[in-house]
């Protein structure tokens, strides 16, 4: 057969049988077929394209498609052949067989262009005229395919719009449906907004709401919603937009009782797309009786139905919730979300309907109803009355886990009006805990939030569960019971949200809570980690056991905790008890969703926990504060470099946490007595020196500091005040000079940044002026200044992308214990150093420090011309000459790179050579091995 293809090109298409075509396909799909045979097959098939009849053209196109798929190198040639034949068919006399072949050719061309991107651009040769001509002349089945796949061809949206709008009047219902779907796709693409065209398309969709076919009416509803929304947005005046919205909404209401289930489902989905309407119309959807405000009212911009009025919306949602098909009920409940956002009265009127939906037979409907209630509760508009409580309690003990989770989410936001309902709700939750013990962590979290929202019933709750606490002391089984853990969760939640006297809570509650720390931490992990929970419970236990001790001493910690959770989660339960408008809450939630930056939230949480730890240390809980800070460092270590937080920012926060950790270790020595023992004095001095070194390193090693610089400078001032308070006799002069200099720098920084100085800075400057040159410094005044230091403010962190860490590396190529550098005692020796600098500014002063084991050291200045490039990373070779060659056979030197801290006004070196200011080191010391030159 192959030879006949090569020798005879005059084979009549009519003489080719299906067996012959099947043999050709066998050659195509056989991987062992030679290239020459494939070439002959290609020539034969392309020849049949131009002279083939409709009987075999379908098979020829299929074979060419298979050939292009198997032999990708032939795809461009096959594409060109089919395209040429398509254009030839377009220019010939139109026949039904030709039109069908043209559509099949388009299908093959579209498939080839998608499989071979290199030839996709050639598809543009099929212009809008060719496509429209084929579309208009194609048979019904082929026309349906063309309309469904129109987006696969480079046809302008204006041409597609005209085609779809025209075919929406086609006598065949499937064509009308596909045409409407095409109009919807054009609208969703957002590239067609001509006013008259939009109104015309909307009008046509409204006309098709009365179509005899269910599928056409269903597509018409979708078209009315999407094109109606575009039409609403096109209105410039607010009044016109509102009237247009009402017109579209009422137009949809007119078909809510359609006999087709699909149409009714689409109507309620469309309500969610429109999202709003006038208050009177929305309220009318909840009442079958026409309300007085809506009688006779007609929207002015209704384009297609002048007789529609507000009465068409009567009982729309009641019909939706009572529909016999669950799909309709689900869609009706789902559309409550968007409508409840834009209406104040609507949620109050709708709660009883949603509560009834909690008895629905279908789980998906109940779940949607709970989500709608949660949405309303999140806006602060949910008021659970006694009538609704049985339905809500049934949801809490529902067999579906998703239902129970959503019900508990509502419980976290619920605010019940009286103690009777509170007790009923607690009983329901405890029943759920017994039925589903696996839900215990989430139930504890829900009870914790519930307790925070009902602190006015704290005394009653404590009284109710006091018997359980008493029984627990004598029963090990009761002590470990889930009922007890739930009771304790309610009791310990109250202090975090209320300044009540903590003595109203028995100390036994906090003691048992400490014993159940692991269980509580797993349930409250979304609000605080185990270290912070331990600190909180310990602090509460101490205060509650002290007779008459009020909660005021611990307020600083609990305010920090509350602020931390409010900033992290945006949870309204943890905010102060002020009335917040529903609109503000909605906008806050929306802004939180738009940010969507989990890494940034995580770091914000870390920073606020740092503040809480510092305030905790001031309350005398230094061990708990140190534990919390170490946990912060471990959490920071989990953030990788590819997160949205820059490495410079992470390095800065880690250094900052380390400084605060040192200050927390220092603080107990300042909190109790001014005069301390010699051992303690040495320990404090070492800690203070480490704090000063770390602060100096932060100032030198980080570039791009903006508001963070004020934070560092305040820490420097704070360190000076601590030194003056403990060691003012021996270091008064240097401390006062450094204090004055730092205050001036900080004031200049605030002027440049146009920011307001903190109270700490203002009070310190005022006190410094009062001290003057006096020899006697008021220690009480110093202590007051130390105690008003806030240590942290979230506004002082801007997470600038310009915040970068300066670092360096130094290597001595080829040097090691077995390949030392040769030297002669007493003579200088050259050390070849390969230096890498990262983020080093041009105006820095770098020194290479070379030291011996006996602490003798030498500084070598690095000329800025060596690293004066513009790149972030700079590499260069530098030969350092050292004169420290002792009389020894072998010895080692240590080399490192440091940056001179020029901002320090006091020179600390009197030598002629070397840095005149303190040096902050940018890398770890590197050992250099040297060996005496061997005599030969």
UniProtKB/Swiss-Prot annotation:
A GO cellular component entry from the record: endosome
Induction: Up-regulated by SHR.
The keyword Nucleus is assigned to this record: yes
Further comment: Hypomorphs (siel-3 and siel-4) have reduced movement of SHR and cause defects in root patterning. Inhibition of microtubules results in mis-localization of SIEL.
Subunit structure: Interacts with SHR, MGP, SCR, JKD, CPC, TMO7 and AGL21, but not with LFY or STM.
Function: Intracellular shuttle that promotes movement of SHR from the stele into the endodermis. Required for SHR association to endosomes and localization, and for intercellular movement of SHR.
Protein name: Protein SIEL
Native source organism of the sequence: Arabidopsis thaliana
Gene behind this protein: SIEL
């Amino acid at each position: 057969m192959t030879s006949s293809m090569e020798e005879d090109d005059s084979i009549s298409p009519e003489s080719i049988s299906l067996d012959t075509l099947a043999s050709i396909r066998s050659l195509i799909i056989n991987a062992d077929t030679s290239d020459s045979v494939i070439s002959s097959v290609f020539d034969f098939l392309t020849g049949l394209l131009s002279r083939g009849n409709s009987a075999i053209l379908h098979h020829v196109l299929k074979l060419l498609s298979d050939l292009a798929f198997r032999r990708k190198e032939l795809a461009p040639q096959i594409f060109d052949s089919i395209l040429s034949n398509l254009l030839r068919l377009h220019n010939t006399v139109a026949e039904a067989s030709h039109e069908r072949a043209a559509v099949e050719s388009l299908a093959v061309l579209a498939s080839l262009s998608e499989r071979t991107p290199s030839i996709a651009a050639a598809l543009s040769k099929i212009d809008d005229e060719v496509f429209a001509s084929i579309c208009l002349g194609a048979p019904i089945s082929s026309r349906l395919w063309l309309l469904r796949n129109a987006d696969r061809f480079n046809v302008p949206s204006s041409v597609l719009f005209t085609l779809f709008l025209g075919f929406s009047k086609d006598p065949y219902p499937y064509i009308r449906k596909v045409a409407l779907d095409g109009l919807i796709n054009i609208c969703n693409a957002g590239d067609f907004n001509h006013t008259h065209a939009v109104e015309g398309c909307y009008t046509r969709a409204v006309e098709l709401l009365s179509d005899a076919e269910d599928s056409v009416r269903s597509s018409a509803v979708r078209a009315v919603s999407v094109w109606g929304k575009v039409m609403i947005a096109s209105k410039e005046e607010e009044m016109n937009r509102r009237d247009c919205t009402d017109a579209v909404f009422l137009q949809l209401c007119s078909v809510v009782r359609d006999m087709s289930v699909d149409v009714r489902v689409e109507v309620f989905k469309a309500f969610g797309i429109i999202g709003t309407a006038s208050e009177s119309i929305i309220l009318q959807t909840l009442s079958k009786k026409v309300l007085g405000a809506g009688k006779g009212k007609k929207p002015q911009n209704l384009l297609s139905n002048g007789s529609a009025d507000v009465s068409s919306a009567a009982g729309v949602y009641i019909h939706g919730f009572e529909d016999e098909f669950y799909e309709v009920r689900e869609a009706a409940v789902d559309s409550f979300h968007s409508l409840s956002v834009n209406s104040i009265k609507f949620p109050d009127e709708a709660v009883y309907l949603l509560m009834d939906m909690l008895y629905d037979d279908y789980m998906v409907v109940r779940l949607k109803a709970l989500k709608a209630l949660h949405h309303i509760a999140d806006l602060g508009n949910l008021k659970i009355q006694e009538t609704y409580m049985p339905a809500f309690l049934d949801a809490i003990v529902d067999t579906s886990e998703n239902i129970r989770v959503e019900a508990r989410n509502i419980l976290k936001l619920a605010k019940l009006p009286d103690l009777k309902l509170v007790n009923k709700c607690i009983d329901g939750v405890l029943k759920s805990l017994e039925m589903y013990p696996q839900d215990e962590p989430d139930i504890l979290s829900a009870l914790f939030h519930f307790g925070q929202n009902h602190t006015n019933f704290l005394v009653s709750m404590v009284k109710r569960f006091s018997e359980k606490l008493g029984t627990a002391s004598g029963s090990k089984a009761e002590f470990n019971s889930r009922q007890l853990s739930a009771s304790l969760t309610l009791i310990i939640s109250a202090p975090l949200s209320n300044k009540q006297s903590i003595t109203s809570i028995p100390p036994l509650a906090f003691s048992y809570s400490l014993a159940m720390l692991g269980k509580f931490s797993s349930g409250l992990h979304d609000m605080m980690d185990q270290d912070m929970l331990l600190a909180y419970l310990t602090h509460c236990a101490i205060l509650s056991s002290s007779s008459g001790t009020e909660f005021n001493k611990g307020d600083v910690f609990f305010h920090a905790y509350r602020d931390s959770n409010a900033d992290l989660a945006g949870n309204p339960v943890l905010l102060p008890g002020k009335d917040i408008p529903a609109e503000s809450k909605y906008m806050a939630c929306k802004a939180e969703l738009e940010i969507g930056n989990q890494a940034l939230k995580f770091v914000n949480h870390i920073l606020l926990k740092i503040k809480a730890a510092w305030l905790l240390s001031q309350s005398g809980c230094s061990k708990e504060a140190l534990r919390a800070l170490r946990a912060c460092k471990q959490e920071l270590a989990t953030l990788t470099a590819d997160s949205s937080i820059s490495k410079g920012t992470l390095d800065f926060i880690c250094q900052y946490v380390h400084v605060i950790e040192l200050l927390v270790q220092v603080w107990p020595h300042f909190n109790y007595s001014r005069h301390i023992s010699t051992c303690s004095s040495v320990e404090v001095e070492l800690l203070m020196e480490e704090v000063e070194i770390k602060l100096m390193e932060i100032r030198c090693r980080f570039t791009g500091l903006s508001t963070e610089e004020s934070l560092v400078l305040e820490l420097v001032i704070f360190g000076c005040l601590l030194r003056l308070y403990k060691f003012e006799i021996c270091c008064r002069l240097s401390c006062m000079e450094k204090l004055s200099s730092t205050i001036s720098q900080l004031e200049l920084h605030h002027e440049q940044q146009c920011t307001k100085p903190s109270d700490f800075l203002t009070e310190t400057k005022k006190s410094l002026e009062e001290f003057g040159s006096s020899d006697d410094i008021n220690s009480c005044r110093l202590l007051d200044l130390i105690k008003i230091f806030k240590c942290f403010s979230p506004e002082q962190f801007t997470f600038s992308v310009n915040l970068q860490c300066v670092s360096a590396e130094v290597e001595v190529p080829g040097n090691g214990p077995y390949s030392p550098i040769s030297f002669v005692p007493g003579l200088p020796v050259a050390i070849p150093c390969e230096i890498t600098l990262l983020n080093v500014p041009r105006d820095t002063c770098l020194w290479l420090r070379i030291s011996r084991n006996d602490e003798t050291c030498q500084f070598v200045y690095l000329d800025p011309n060596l690293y004066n490039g513009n790149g972030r990373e700079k590499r260069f070779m530098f030969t350092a000459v050292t004169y420290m060659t002792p009389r020894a056979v072998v010895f080692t030197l240590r080399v490192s790179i440091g940056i001179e801290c020029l901002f320090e006004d006091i020179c600390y070196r009197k030598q002629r050579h070397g840095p005149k200011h303190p040096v902050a080191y940018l890398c770890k010391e590197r050992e250099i091995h040297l060996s005496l030159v061997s005599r030969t």
